[in-house]
From Swiss-Prot:
Quaternary organization: Interacts with SAC3A, EER5 and CML19. Interacts with UCH1 and UCH2.
Region (Disordered) residue spans: 54-134, 167-280, 306-413, 491-512
Polar residues bias (residue ranges): 193-202, 233-243, 257-280, 335-380
Name this polypeptide is given: SAC3 family protein B
Family matches, as InterPro entries: MCM3AP_GANP (IPR031907), PCI_dom (IPR000717), SAC3/GANP/THP3 (IPR045107), SAC3/GANP/THP3_conserved (IPR005062)
Biological source species: Arabidopsis thaliana (Mouse-ear cress)
Source organism, top-level taxon: Eukaryota
Biological role stated in the UniProt entry: Component of the TREX-2 complex (transcription and export complex 2), a muliprotein complex that functions in docking export-competent ribonucleoprotein particles (mRNPs) to the nuclear entrance of the nuclear pore complex (nuclear basket). TREX-2 participates in mRNA export and accurate chromatin positioning in the nucleus by tethering genes to the nuclear periphery.
GO cellular component: nuclear periphery
Keyword entries, A-Z: Nucleus
Gene disruption phenotype: No visible phenotype. Sac3a, sac3b and sac3c triple mutants show no visible phenotype.
Pfam family, one: MCM3AP_GANP
C-alpha cells in the first residue's frame, strides 16, 4: 500500500528518504546538523540506504532533545511537518508504536522533538520479538557520545533491533525461536482485534495546525498485544503518564503544563528565562547530567510555545486553558470517554501541572531515561498530528493558512464520514483505566474494531494533509468536558434562582427566598445536561459540595429529616450528573456514590411513614428513592468492575454488594423485584465477593424471607447493621403478616399464644403489637399474662399492616445522621490474583514504617509480572514540591526484609518524578541503565543470570527490575540509574518497595486468537520474515555489559546494606551500653551486708519469729471474708427498722450496675481489675443457687442478676418481729430497664478508671432515665482502684460521670467508695475490701427514702369516716338554716377528701414500692405471708388504679338543688293549700331524683319521695292562722345519700390504701370542729308524727268529717301503700343484705324517740277526741300496724346510717 507523505506516493517498504528539509532553520541549526553528520560518520554509524540517519545516542550529548526528521536531518525551529515513520524511512520506531501493514506507519505525535529513536537506545522496531523478562541496559554517554549498540545500529528495515537483556520463554509454537512471539504478527492480530483509541493533548497552533501529544486510551477488551514488546515491553498500555517533559521519548521542553509555566519574557530570550527553567525540572536535570551543555534550540521551542499560546487564545477564545486552574490538578479524577468530540471542536490547550503527575509511577531525576517513552499505545488507532508551522513562514508552498486548513478539515471530515459511514455507529462507554483519566483531555477517540483496521490504514494519509482531528469527530457521541466551576453552584444558576425565588430553605440567607450566597447555594439537578465547562464542577468542588451536604446531616434524627432529604437527594443527583459529564470514575467518585446510596437506604426506613407529596406539600416517594438508589448502584458497580480489572479491590465493594442483594430480596412497597434477579446478581459477582460476610448475610436473609422463616429473619435483623436493617425493614410487615397467618392456621378457636413470645418472634418487643393482632383478627385476653387468641377468620391476609418505623431498627442507628451516611474509615488495599507474602518492613532511617503510596496499580493480565502496592490516602503528597538534587548524591531507601525468602531492596523515588521513568503505555516503563564504566566498543547483550522462579515456570522478571544474588539468598529489585543519583534528603520515608507477583498470560495471549482474518495473517507472515533476520552477536555483546553492570549494582547494594546494618547495629550497641550502665547503677545502689539499724528501730521491732503459716492463715481469712456472700438485710436491717418503727414488713431494693458488658476480654490491666471487681460484687450480692449452701435460710431467692435476702428483727418483745427484705438487682441482666428500677430504694454504680468516663457516664444516665422523678434516691459509686486512706470523692470521676449535674429529684445525694485494699495500691488486685462495701450499704440505707405507712380501708368506710362528722354538725343546726345545697356540699366534700387521701398516698410512692421481686417468694414461707399481710399490692399506687378509684368517687357526687323553695315561707290558710304545697314539694324532689341526679326511675322516685316527706316534714302553725310546711332537709338527703353510695360496693374498687397520717389528721380536725360548735346549737327536737297524720289532726276542725266509708277506704289505701312500699323495699334491698350484715347498725336516737312519741301521741289523740270506741280501736290498730311497718323499714334502711 502506498504511503503518501506530503502528497508523494511511496511504495511499500520503501527505503527512499523522505523529502524533508529544515525550512527556516537558523545558521546555528544548520551548523549543528553539519556537525552531527560528521560526527555520525566518525563514530562508524552504520546507515541504511537512506541518505542520512540520526545518531542513535544523541540523547546523551549536549544536543539532546533536538528533533530529527526521518531522513536524519536535524529539524530547525521552523519544522513544517514531520514525515511518517515508515518501516524503511525512519530507522527507529517508538516504543509501543503500532505497526501499520504495507509499510504504513501512523504519524507519530510531533513535539518538535524527534522520536525516541533519535536519542539513546532506539525503541524496539516493529519486528522485534517480545522479551518477557529482564531489562535493557545501555552504557552512559561519555562527553556527549553514546556508547553501545546504537553507535553502529542499522536500520530496522535491514535487521530488526534485538532488545538486549531479555529472556524469552517458550510460550507458544507460533512465537519465535526463542520463545517470544514475533511483534509484527502480534501487532497485526491486535490491530484487528482491539485498537484502543488514542486521545491526544493538542496544543493549538495556526488554527488547525497543532502539536498533538498522543495518549493511549484503554478499551474495555484486553488484547494479547498488551504484553508484547511493541506495547512498552510487556507493560500495560493502560497506565500512561500525563503530559510531561518527555513525550514519545523526546524532551518536550516547551510543553510544560500551563499551571506551572508563565512566559514572562520574549521568545528571543527564552533560553535565559528563569521562570521557564524553574518550571521545567527535566531541563535542569539534563543540564546537570551533561555538564555545561546547553540547549541551542531553546529559543525555537519558546517561539513555538509563544505562537501556540497566542494562536490558541485567538482562534478558540472560548476554550479557556484549563490547566491554569489549580482545581484541575486532580488525581484519578477523569476517565476518558470513548466518544469523539463534536464537530468543530477545537483542541484545548490542556496540560497538567507539575504537581499532578502520576504518583504511582517511578520518577527520576535523569532525563535520559525518558527518551524511551512513547505517546501512542501499541496497536492503537493512529494519532494524526498536523505539522508545526512557525509564525514566520519562509516558503509559501508549505505554508497553510488557517482558513485553508479549516476547509481542508471539513473536506477530510466529509471523506471520512462517507468512508466510515457504516462503521461509526456509537458504541457504549467502556470502563477505562484510571491511569488514563489523569490527563484533562477534552478529545476522545473510539477504538477500532476488526472491520476498521484496513480502513484505518487507508485513512492514515489524511494525517499528511493537515488534518489533525480524529476520525470519529463527526460521531454523535458527546465530548469529554472538564468542569471549571469554582463554586458549589454556578454563578449564572445562582443568579437565576435568586430572581425566581427558587431557593431551598437550606440555601436562603436569613430565610429570604430571593437571596443566597456562595456558601449556601448548591447546584440544582436539571434533566438537560450542561455542555459548558463553567457550569460543571470539577472533582475537588464536588467533594467540597458533598462535604457541605453531609454537614447538614450532622444532627440527630428528627422530623426535619424529610425536608432535608428532599434537598439532599436533588443536589446529590446533580453531583452524579457532573461526574458522568466529566467521566470521573475514580476512588473519590466511588466514595461520593457510596454516600449517596447510604442516604437513600436510611430514607427507606426513616421516611417510610410519609406518603408521596401532592402539590406544594413535602412527601416521600419510596419508588423514586429506590429507583435513584438503583441507578447509583449500577454506576457504582461498574466502577468496582473497572477497578477490579486493574487489580484494585475497593474495600467497600462487599458492603454495597450486600446492600444491593438485600434490596433484591423480594418485592415490597415502592419496588418490584423479579424472582430471578437476586440469583442473577449473585451469579455475576466474583467468587470472592459472593463469599464475603455481607453477601452471605444477604443470602441468609433472602433464604429466610422467601421461605417464610420469620424467626430466622428477625433474628438476622437483630444482628444486622443499621443500614442492613433499614433495607430489611421494607419486608417487616410482609413477614409479620405471614407469621401471623401461619400461627393462625395452626391454632384452634379460643387457643392462643403469649403476646410476649410473639413480639419476640416478629421483632416487636417495644411496639404496639396489640394493634397488629387486632388488625388481623386476633383478640387479646389476659390470663397470667396477655395472650393472643384466635377468634375467627384471619383478616387482611392480602393487605399488610401499615408500615411504621421500627424500634428494632432505631436501636442500631448512630447519634447523628452523618455518622451513618459517611463512609467508614478503612485502609485501602490492593488485591492480586495470588496471595501476597507477609512483609516485614524495617525503616532504616528514623525507624519509621510505611507503605508505598502508589496511586495507580498495574492491571492484571497485562504483563508476566505485576507490581502491586498499598495505597495511603495522602492528598498533600501530590501537591508537594521537592527540589532537584545534584547528580553526585548517593541513593538511600528503605527495604523489605523477608527472612525465609529473598531479600528485596527497592528504590525510594519521589512521587513527583515518577513519571520520568514511566512510558506512555505502562505503569512501569522499561528502564534503561547506564553504567559509568561502560565501554563504547562492547554492545549490550542479553542478561545471563536471569532465572525463573522455582516451582513456577510462568514467573519471570518484569522489564523494570532485575534480581541478582548478593549474599546467599539475597536479591534486590532493580534501581534505575537516575534513582542512584538522588539524595537521601529527598526520599520520603513513607515509601516501601512493592512485591512482584507473577501472572499467567496464557488466557490473555489466546484471548483474541480466533479474531484474526486470513488477509491480515498473510500480511503479518510476510512482514515477519523480513524482521526475523537478527544478528546473534548483538545479544552476546549485550550480556557482557549487563554482567558488568550487575556486579557493580550488586556491590553498591551490598555497600548500602552494610551501611544500614552498621547504623542499626550502632544504635543497638548504644542501647545495650545504656542498659548495662543502668543495671550497674542499680546494683551499686544495693546495700552490702546487714543494714545498719538504730536503737529506736530495734526497740520498735516486734519480738518473735516470722511465721509463714500464720501469714498464710491471715491471708486465707482475709480472702474468705472478701469472697464471702453478703446478706444485705443483715447489714441494713437495724437502720431500716429504726427509720420505719411502725412497719411490720420492710422491703428495700438496691439497683446494681456492674458494667460487665462494657469490659472487653483483651483490655488493659485496669479494665481487667474492673472485670474482677464486677464478678466479685455479683458473687457476693447475687450468688448462684447452686453455689449457695442448703441451710442458708436468709437467701430467699437467687437467680442470675437478682437475689432476695431476709432478716427478722425483734421489735421490743420476743413475740413481735419485723421482717426485713432486701433485694439486689443487676440492670445488665435484663433488657427492661423500667422494670429493673421499679421499687428501687438505692442505686449502686461500679465505676472503673480504665474505661472511658464518657461511656460510663452514658451508662449511668441510661439507668437514671428509668428512675421516676421525685424518687430522691441515694447513689453509691464504687471504684475498684485505691484512692488512699480517706475515701474522698475523686475529682476526675465526679466530673467524668457528671455527678454534680444529675437531676436532684432523682438522685438526692451520692458517695464514692473504693473497695481496693490499701496494701494493693500499685499492685495487682487479688481481693477487695468487704468492710468498705458494708459501709457503703449502710450509707445507702440511711439516705434511702422512708417506706410509706399505709392503712388499708374500704371506700365506704373511708367516705363515712369523713362524712359522719359533717353529718353530726348538720344535725345540730336548726332546720331553717340547713338547706338542700348545704347537705349536698357536705356530701361532696367528704367524697373529695377521700379522693385526695388516695391520691396523696400514691404520690408519696414515686418509686413504685414495694418492689416486684417480693412476689418471687415461695407461698409456703412465712416471709410470703408477711408480704401479703402487711405490704400493699404491687399496683396500688399505679396511675391506672388511682384513676379508677378517683373516678368511682367522682361519680358519686350529687348535683346542686336548683329549685326555688321560697314559696315554702308562704303560709297555708286551708287544707287544700296544704295539700297543694305538699304535692309541689314532692314534685321538686321527684324531678331532682330522676332528671338531675339520675338516681332512680319515676315510679320509684314517687314512692321514695312520699316516704321522705312523711318522715322528715312537719306542719307548723304561725300566728294561729296560717300553717307552714317545714321540711327537715338533713333527713331527706340522708336517705338520698344512702342511695348514692350504693355504687361504692363494687368489688373491684371497694378498697384503697391511704396514709395513716392523713386519716388521723382528718378525724382529729372533724372532732375538734364538732366539739367547738356543739354548744351553740340546740338539741335535736324529738321526732314528729307523719305528715299526713299531722295534717289530718291539725286541720280536722277546718274540714267536714268524712264519711265512714271514705275513711275506711283511706285506711285500706294506706295499708296497701305500706304493703307495696314494703315489697319494693324488700326487693330492692335484698341484693345488699349480704353485704350489709357485717356493718354496724347506725340507727340514731331520733328514730327511737320518734317511735315512742308516735305511740303515746296516738293514744292521747284518741282519748282527747273521744271518738267512738270502735273507731278509736281501729285507729289504734292502724297505728300499731304503721309502727310495725316503720320499724321494719328502719331495720332495712339501717345500712344507710
Amino acid at each position: 500500500m502506498a504511503f503518501r507523505p506530503f502528497g508523494k506516493d511511496l511504495g511499500p517498504m520503501s527505503s527512499k528518504p523522505a523529502p524533508f528539509t529544515p525550512f527556516g532553520a537558523s545558521s546555528t541549526t544548520r551548523l549543528y546538523l553539519s556537525f552531527l553528520f560528521l560526527h555520525t560518520a566518525n563514530v562508524g554509524f552504520a546507515c541504511s540506504d537512506s541518505s542520512i540517519q540520526p545518531p542513535a545516542s544523541q540523547n546523551h550529548s549536549a544536543f539532546a532533545g533536538q528533533s530529527f526528521g526521518p531522513g536524519g536531518i536535524r529539524s530547525g525551529p521552523s519544522i513544517q511537518r514531520a514525515p511518517p515513520l515508515s518501516a524503511s524511512q525512519n530507522p527507529q520506531l517508538s516504543i509501543g508504536k503500532p505497526y501499520r501493514p504495507g509499510g504504513v506507519q501512523s504519524v507519530p505525535p510531533i513535539n518538535r522533538i524527534p522520536s525516541p529513536s533519535a536519542f539513546q537506545n532506539p525503541s524496539p522496531s516493529s519486528g522485534q520479538p517480545y522479551q518477557p523478562g529482564g531489562i535493557q541496559r545501555i552504557p552512559e554517554p561519555f562527553n556527549g557520545i553514546a556508547w553501545g549498540p546504537e553507535a553502529s545500529r542499522t536500520s530496522p528495515s535491514v535487521r530488526p533491533y534485538q532488545f538486549p537483556g531479555v529472556q524469552r520463554p517458550n510460550l507458544n509454537p507460533q512465537y519465535g525461536h526463542d520463545g517470544s512471539r514475533n511483534f509484527l504478527k502480534d501487532h497485526g492480530e491486535h490491530s484487528r482485534a482491539t485498537s484502543p483509541p488514542a486521545t491526544s493533548h493538542i496544543l493549538s497552533r495556526m488554527g488547525t495546525d497543532a502539536v498533538e501529544i498522543g495518549r493511549s486510551q484503554d478499551s474495555k477488551r484486553k488484547s494479547r498485544s498488551d504484553i508484547l514488546p511493541d506495547q512498552n515491553m510487556g507493560f500495560s498500555r493502560r497506565n500512561q503518564s500525563p503530559v510531561s517533559g518527555f513525550e514519545n521519548g523526546n524532551l518536550v521542553d516547551g510543553f510544560q503544563p500551563l499551571s506551572s509555566r508563565t512566559w514572562m519574557r520574549s521568545p528571543s530570550s527564552a533560553e535565559n528565562n528563569p521562570v521557564r527553567s524553574r518550571s521545567n525540572p527535566n531541563q535542569l536535570i539534563h543540564q546537570e547530567q551533561t555538564g555545561n551543555s546547553s540547549f541551542p534550540y531553546a529559543h525555537e521551542v519558546a517561539e513555538i510555545q509563544e505562537a501556540t499560546r497566542r494562536k490558541s487564545s485567538a482562534v478558540a477564545p472560548s476554550d479557556k486553558p484549563l490547566g491554569d486552574d489549580p482545581i484541575l490538578s486532580q488525581h484519578d479524577s477523569q476517565r476518558f470517554s470513548t466518544s469523539p468530540p463534536t464537530s468543530g471542536t477545537k483542541s484545548y490547550t490542556l496540560s497538567r501541572s507539575s504537581d499532578s503527575q502520576f504518583p504511582g509511577q517511578p520518577s527520576s531525576v535523569n532525563s535520559f531515561n525518558n527518551a524511551r517513552k512513547t505517546n501512542s499505545s501499541p496497536a492503537t488507532k493512529r494519532t494524526r498530528s498536523p505539522p508545526v508551522y512557525p509564525i514566520e513562514e519562509d516558503i509559501p508552498r508549505n505554508s497553510f493558512p488557517s482558513q485553508d486548513c479549516t476547509e481542508g478539515e471539513e473536506q477530510a471530515r466529509a471523506k471520512r464520514l462517507a468512508r466510515f459511514k457504516g462503521e461509526l455507529e456509537p458504541i457504549a462507554d467502556r470502563p477505562v483505566d484510571i491511569q488514563l483519566t489523569k490527563s484533562p483531555v477534552n478529545k476522545t477517540m473510539k477504538p477500532l474494531d476488526n472491520k476498521q483496521t484496513f480502513n484505518s490504514l487507508e485513512s492514515s494519509r489524511d494525517a499528511l494533509k493537515g488534518d489533525a482531528l480524529p476520525d470519529y469527530e463527526n460521531s454523535e457521541q458527546p465530548s469529554l468536558i472538564i468542569g471549571v466551576c469554582p463554586d458549589m453552584c454556578p454563578e449564572s444558576e445562582r443568579g437565576e434562582r435568586e430572581r425566581k425565588g427558587d431557593l431551598d430553605h437550606y440555601e436562603r440567607v436569613d430565610g429570604d427566598r430571593n437571596q443566597t450566597s456562595k456558601s449556601l447555594a448548591v447546584k440544582k439537578y436539571t434533566r438537560t445536561a450542561e455542555r459548558e465547562a463553567i457550569l460543571i464542577r470539577p472533582m475537588p468542588i464536588l467533594q467540597n459540595t458533598m462535604e457541605y451536604l453531609l454537614s447538614l446531616l450532622d444532627r440527630p434524627y428528627n422530623e426535619n429529616f424529610l425536608g432535608m432529604y428532599n434537598f439532599l437527594w436533588d443536589r446529590m443527583r446533580a453531583i452524579r450528573m457532573d461526574l458522568r459529564m466529566q467521566h470521573i470514575f475514580n476512588q473519590e467518585a466511588i466514595t461520593l456514590l457510596e454516600q449517596m446510596i447510604r442516604l437513600h437506604i436510611i430514607a427507606m426506613h426513616e421516611l417510610c411513614e410519609y406518603t408521596k407529596g401532592e402539590g406544594f406539600s413535602e412527601g416521600f416517594d419510596a419508588h423514586l428513592n429506590i429507583e435513584q438508589m438503583n441507578k447509583t448502584s449500577v454506576e457504582l458497580f461498574q466502577m468496582y468492575d473497572d477497578h477490579r480489572k486493574k487489580g484494585i479491590t475497593v474495600p467497600t465493594e462487599k458492603e454495597f454488594r450486600g446492600y444491593y442483594a438485600l434490596l433484591k430480596l423480594d418485592k415490597h412497597p415502592g419496588y418490584k423485584v423479579e424472582p430471578s434477579e437476586l440469583s442473577l446478581d449473585l451469579a455475576n459477582m466474583t467468587p470472592e465477593i459472593r463469599q464475603t460476610s455481607e453477601v452471605l448475610f444477604a443470602r441468609n436473609v433472602a433464604r429466610a424471607c422467601r421461605t417464610g422463616n420469620f424467626i430466622a429473619f428477625f433474628r438476622l435483623a437483630r444482628k444486622a447493621s443499621y443500614l442492613q436493617a433499614c433495607l430489611m425493614h421494607a419486608h417487616f410487615s410482609k413477614l409479620r403478616t405471614q407469621a401471623l397467618a401461619s400461627l393462625h392456621s395452626g391454632l384452634q378457636i379460643n387457643q392462643g399464644l403469649p403476646v410476649s413470645d410473639m413480639s419476640n418472634w416478629i421483632g416487636m418487643e417495644e411496639e404496639d403489637i396489640e394493634a397488629l393482632l387486632e388488625y388481623h383478627g386476633f383478640s387479646i385476653k389476659v390470663f397470667e399474662e396477655p395472650y393472643m387468641v384466635k377468634n375467627d377468620l384471619f383478616l387482611h391476609a392480602d393487605k399488610d399492616y401499615k408500615t411504621k418505623c421500627s424500634k428494632l431498627v432505631h436501636m442500631k442507628k448512630s447519634r447523628t445522621i452523618v455518622e451513618d451516611v459517611s463512609a467508614p474509615t478503612v485502609v485501602e488495599d490492593v488485591s492480586t490474583p495470588f496471595p501476597l507474602p507477609s512483609l516485614i518492613t524495617e525503616a532504616t532511617i528514623g525507624n519509621q514504617q510505611c507503605i508505598t503510596a502508589h496511586k495507580h496499580e498495574m492491571p492484571p493480565a497485562r504483563s508476566l509480572k505485576k507490581q502491586t502496592s498499598m495505597r495511603l490516602f495522602d492528598k498533600e503528597v501530590a501537591d508537594s514540591k521537592t527540589s532537584l538534587l545534584a547528580e553526585e548524591d548517593k541513593p538511600m531507601g528503605t527495604f523489605v526484609m523477608n527472612p525465609p525468602g529473598p531479600f528485596v531492596i527497592n528504590p525510594v523515588v519521589h512521587q513527583e518524578k515518577q513519571n520520568d521513568l514511566t512510558s506512555a503505555g505502562g505503569f512501569h516503563s522499561p528502564v534503561k541503565l547506564y553504567s559509568p564504566f561502560g565501554s563504547p566498543k562492547f554492545p549490550q547483550t542479553k542478561s545471563s543470570n536471569l532465572e525463573k522462579q522455582p516451582n513456577d515456570d510462568r514467573i519471570g522478571m518484569s522489564p523494570g527490575e532485575i534480581k541478582f544474588s548478593i549474599i546467599g539468598d539475597v536479591y534486590t529489585n532493580h534501581v534505575p540509574g537516575p534513582a542512584l543519583q538522588q539524595s537521601p534528603k529527598s526520599m520520603p520515608m513513607e515509601i516501601m518497595p512493592v512485591t512482584t507477583i507473577a501472572e499467567c498470560p496464557t488466557s490473555v495471549e489466546n484471548k483474541y486468537a480466533l479474531e484474526e482474518s486470513v488477509p491480515e495473517a498473510a500480511m503479518i507472515c510476510t512482514l515477519e520474515k523480513e524482521f526475523n533476520d537478527i544478528d546473534e552477536e548483538d545479544e552476546d555483546e549485550d550480556g557482557v555489559i549487563l554482567n558488568q553492570y550487575d556486579e557493580e549494582v550488586a556491590k553498591a547494594k551490598l555497600k548500602l546494606i552494610i551501611r544500614l546494618w552498621k547504623r542499626w547495629s550502632s544504635r543497638q550497641s548504644e542501647l545495650r551500653e545504656r542498659r548495662q550502665l543502668a543495671a550497674a547503677a542499680a546494683l551499686n545502689s544495693l546495700s552490702l551486708g546487714t543494714p545498719i539499724r538504730f536503737s529506736k528501730t530495734d526497740q520498735s521491732r516486734a519480738c518473735g519469729e516470722f511465721n509463714i503459716d500464720q501469714a498464710m492463715r491471715r491471708r486465707f481469712e482475709e480472702r474468705e471474708k472478701s469472697w464471702s456472700r453478703l446478706n444485705i438485710s443483715d447489714v441494713i436491717a437495724d437502720i431500716l427498722v429504726g427509720r420505719n418503727p411502725e412497719s411490720k414488713c420492710i422491703s428495700w431494693k438496691v439497683v446494681l450496675c456492674t458494667q460487665t458488658k462494657s469490659v472487653n476480654s483483651s483490655s488493659s490491666a485496669s479494665q481487667v481489675t474492673h472485670s474482677a471487681a464486677s464478678r466479685w460484687l455479683s458473687s457476693k450480692l447475687m450468688p448462684h443457687a447452686e453455689h449457695s449452701s442448703l441451710n442458708d435460710d436468709n437467701l430467699l431467692f437467687s437467680a442470675p442478676g437478682v437475689s432476695v435476702w431476709n432478716k427478722w428483727v425483734a421489735n421490743g418483745s420476743d413475740i413481735d418481729f419485723t421482717c426485713c427484705l432486701s433485694v439486689a438487682r443487676d440492670v445488665e441482666a435484663e433488657n427492661d430497664m423500667c422494670e429493673t428500677t421499679c421499687g428501687a430504694s438505692a442505686v449502686l454504680f461500679l465505676a472503673s478508671g480504665g474505661l472511658p468516663l464518657n461511656l460510663q457516664r452514658e451508662q449511668l444516665n441510661l439507668i437514671l432515665e428509668s428512675v421516676p422523678n421525685g424518687s430522691v434516691l441515694p447513689l453509691l459509686v464504687v471504684i475498684s482502684s485505691c484512692n488512699g486512706e480517706h475515701m474522698e470523692p475523686d475529682t476526675d470521676i465526679v466530673s467524668g460521670l457528671g455527678l454534680h449535674d444529675i437531676d436532684k429529684s432523682k438522685i438526692a445525694s451520692f458517695s464514692i467508695v473504693s473497695i481496693a485494699n490499701k496494701s494493693q495500691k500499685g499492685q495487682e488486685v487479688h481481693f477487695f475490701n468487704d468492710s468498705r462495701l458494708r459501709d457503703g450499704f449502710k450509707w445507702l440505707a440511711s439516705n434511702s427514702p422512708l417506706q410509706p405507712n399505709l392503712h388499708h380501708v374500704k371506700l365506704r368506710e373511708l367516705f363515712l369516716t369523713h362524712f359522719s362528722f359533717s353529718l353530726e354538725l348538720l344535725k345540730q343546726m336548726p332546720d331553717q338554716e340547713v338547706g338542700p345545697n348545704i347537705c349536698i356540699s357536705a356530701f361532696n366534700d367528704a367524697l373529695e377528701t377521700s379522693r385526695r387521701n388516695i391520691t396523696s398516698a400514691a404520690e408519696a410512692n414515686p418509686i413504685g414500692w414495694p418492689c416486684p421481686e417480693t412476689m418471687l417468694l415461695e407461698d409456703n414461707r412465712k416471709e410470703c405471708l408477711m408480704v401479703k399481710r402487711y405490704l400493699p399490692n404491687l399496683d396500688w399506687s399505679s396511675a391506672e388504679n388511682v384513676e379508677l378509684l378517683s373516678s368511682v368517687l367522682e361519680n358519686c357526687k350529687l348535683p346542686d338543688f336548683e329549685d326555688d323553695l321560697t314559696w315554702l315561707t308562704v303560709g297555708c290558710a286551708s287544707g287544700a293549700e296544704i295539700e297543694n304545697h305538699t304535692q309541689r314539694l314532692e314534685g321538686c324532689l321527684i324531678e331532682y331524683l330522676t332528671q338531675r341526679s339520675n338516681l332512680m326511675g319515676v315510679s320509684l322516685a314517687t314512692k321514695e319521695t312520699g316516704v321522705m316527706l312523711e318522715r322528715n316534714t312537719r306542719l307548723e302553725l304561725h300566728n294561729s292562722s296560717r300553717y307552714h310546711i317545714t321540711p327537715r332537709w338533713i333527713g331527706i338527703f340522708q336517705r338520698i345519700f344512702n342511695w348514692r353510695i350504693m355504687g361504692l360496693f363494687d368489688a373491684s374498687s371497694s378498697s384503697a390504701y391511704v396514709l395513716k397520717s392523713d386519716l388521723n389528721m382528718s378525724t382529729s380536725s372533724y372532732a375538734d370542729k364538732f366539739l367547738a360548735e356543739d354548744a351553740s346549737y340546740p338539741s335535736c327536737p324529738p321526732n314528729l308524727p307523719l305528715l299526713h297524720e299531722m295534717i289530718e289532726i291539725s286541720c280536722s276542725p277546718l274540714k267536714s268529717p268524712p264519711p265512714y266509708d271514705d275513711k275506711a277506704q283511706r285506711v285500706v289505701e294506706t295499708g296497701m301503700l305500706i304493703d307495696d312500699h314494703r315489697d319494693i323495699e324488700e326487693s330492692m334491698l335484698e341484693k345488699n343484705r349480704e353485704a350489709c350484715r357485717g356493718i354496724d347498725l347506725m340507727i340514731t336516737e331520733d328514730d327511737e324517740l320518734g317511735e315512742r312519741s308516735w305511740r303515746s301521741k296516738g293514744r292521747e289523740a284518741a282519748e282527747k277526741k273521744t271518738i267512738e270506741k270502735r273507731e278509736s280501736e281501729r285507729l289504734d290498730e292502724l297505728l300499731e300496724k304503721c309502727n310495725m311497718v316503720q320499724n321494719s323499714i328502719a331495720e332495712k334502711l339501717c345500712i344507710y346510717f
